[in-house]
Amino acid sequence: MRSDATRNREAILRATEELLAAHGAEHISLDRVAAAAGVGKGTLFRRFGSRTGLFQELLAERAAALALAIETPGSALGPGAPPEDRLTAFLDELCELAERNLALFAAHERACAEDKYRDPTYLRWHAHVTALIAAARPEGGLDAEFAAHALLGSFDADLARHVMADGGVARLKSAVRGLAEALLEGAATPRTRR
């Protein structure tokens, strides 16, 4: 990427962050972002394509460290740790990411509402959580893909905001961990089907 393109990208992403922090997701237009970044609207469109593309790119940037950690051996999130531990560590990190970026999560959800299950960041998170659940319960008993959707649904911005309003990120972590444990323990417990 050329240096001016890199500079413009950074200016646009930082302007988006500032507008989200100051005004929330409802008041962010591409015109406002372009003006705040000091670039033309055409520059913004060429780089991101749409408001959805802009929020997808910003979330991907915010989640980049998490993406790297899940691939790094030796970290609590990385290969080599037991899948249950990796799942808990990943969910804890998502809780932290949600707390720091709640306005971005809300903006991203609204922008991607038509097709949120095809968003690149969501797809990476879903594939990772699905693989960890499947590794934790190789004997089956749990639809790992559906369970991953259920766990990731805990990071809906409105739900996360509501849960964190009384107990902060510690409550969100506890609730999400409890859900993950219940799903995994329930899958390990044989039961008769009706």
Where in this protein do the model-derived segments appear?
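Amphipathic C-terminal alpha-helical segment
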Residues: 97-100, 104, 131-135, 149-169, ...
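Amphipathic alpha-helical interaction segments
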Residues: 11, 53, 85-89, 93, ...
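Basic, helix-initiating cap at the start of DNA-binding domains
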Residues: 1-23, 27-36, 53-56, 61, ...
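Amphipathic alpha-helical packing segments from all-alpha helical-bundle domains
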Residues: 67, 89, 96-100, 112-138, ...
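Short amphipathic alpha-helical elements of helix-turn-helix/winged-helix folds
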Residues: 15-19, 57, 69, 93, ...
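Short linear capping/connector segments at secondary-structure termini
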Residues: 71-73, 106-115
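Short hydrophobic/aromatic patch on the recognition helix
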Residues: 38-48
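Amphipathic alpha-helical linker/stalk segments
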Residues: 60-89
